[in-house]
Amino acid sequence: MVAAKGNGAHGTETYTMGIHTSKHNLEVAKRENAVVLMEDNYQKNYQGFDPKLPESHILLSLYQSAYNDNSIKLAQNIQHQFKSRVGRKSRGVKQAGLLVLWKTTAPSVLVEVGFITHPQEEKYLNSKLGQMYIASGIFRAFRDYKNELEANS
């Protein structure tokens, strides 16, 4: 879930590892990655990564892996399920240098399922039905992604 300024933002978005394609994506990456500073021994755990330094974001962009195309395909499947089957507004697939996607050894995505600053969306996200639909959409997207991979190999 995402907290955004104001209460007009709503919908889902899915991130894959990538270079910052917009100023907004760079700001999201900086904000999301800043939480590592709260951890004990973050410099050791993250090999000197400092979300405040531009060099760290350049380093993240260099770690775009061979799994990038597969990550994008999985992210597209998730957004398709959210829009067509779950009835959510899709804010699209985006790329950003998010630490949670760094150095993965498999396709990886970060799914933002909604904005808690939007009152109706917060209510939906807190409901059992909303949680079931969101989880079901992610499951179907992964199942379809897996079936596509197996059919092409």
Features from the language model and the residues they span:
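Active-site-proximal helix/loop segments of hydrolytic enzymes
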Residues: 1-153
